Amino acid sequence: MSFSTISVIGLGYIGLPTAAAFASRQRRVVGVDINQHAVETINRGEIHIVEPDLASVVKTAVEQGYLSATTVPVESDAYLIAVPTPFKGGHEPDMAFVESAAKSIAPTLKKGALVILESTSPVGSTEQMAEWLAAMRPDLSFPQQVGEAADVNVAYCPERVLPGQVMVELIKNDRVIGGMSPVCSARASELYTIFLEGECVVTNSRTAEMCKLTENSFRDVNIAFANELSLICADQGINVWELIRLANRHPRVNILQPGPGVGGHCIAVDPWFIVAQNPQQARLIRTAREVNDHKPEWVIDRVKAQVAECLNASNKRASELTIACFGLAFKPNIDDLRESPAMEIAAQIARWHSGATQVVEPNIHALPKKLDGLCTLATLDDALASADVLVMLVDHNEFKAVSGDSVTQAYIIDTKGVWR
């Protein structure tokens, strides 16, 4: 069966670029999302997220009739599920969105269809998804029932893209293809080669699921090392940025850069999936998560110390002091605030501080609900001109373009080494 109609369930930071990539190859793509605003925006040929080069691809695809969006799934040859997989209060994976997406497409499945889970998920999630589908469609056979003879093929194929470079990496990067059977893997590989220039590397679904979790946990552990170094260096009176620069001159050392914590829907979340399934074995992974989760508290303590110094050196009351936080996104040059330590830090500062708290985030036009009423959204120039204490949280290009020599405030907490 050729892939004449492809459905992408979930039109967020991964789903929409994926839909656009298929549509750019002149395939009919139907994007499905429960967000009516997102659906209407896409059908106008516009986008509701910030991602370089995405807007032009979506605009062209919609105008040419290859891409449309809806809130209701339609019969398709292939379905890609790219919905959130957050964790619950106790760090257990929450698969409710995947379950809902799977059950929404089940009535539209036909013989020969391919269903791919892209959402980062615990090991065994693809098999669970296939069970949900089978329970709703007893008239069709699935890989866990009849193997390669299944009517519906099922696979797990995680993305590995960098926000801000998604439209390039989606096409260029290798893709792990984890089918529930060799036939499932072959069909999934056939689908991705429609736009993929990288290699399709075939394995089984459980290994593919663990591969995605491993990649993000590896990065989390390495970031934790850098963040822990920043705490140690602060106590020792050592410039952590200089230290890392010197250490990285060793030919076999490559320390990452510290920051205010770890955010985003991947690195800050996925390691907990391993910990939840392997609590006794995943001790290093758990510790890395705890180190990175603690970093925002450390930053806030540094802010409080700088505010105290500022008050001691001036005649101002705390209510007369202005604190400016630079950046809310979880990484530079994007608008994605998911699991952002910067936003959590800004919110806690605003709740604690009796004076004004400004935030500067060049990639958004309005404050998120979490900060509404707590902070004011300021321009870069206004914040630099009016704030007494500066808190650098995200190294956006706009901030790096400002020379540190021109920043005259004495009280700066720079978690990214931009101005200090």
Positions of the model-derived regions?
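Structural/interface elements that position substrates and couple domains in central-metabolism enzymes
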Residues: M1-R420
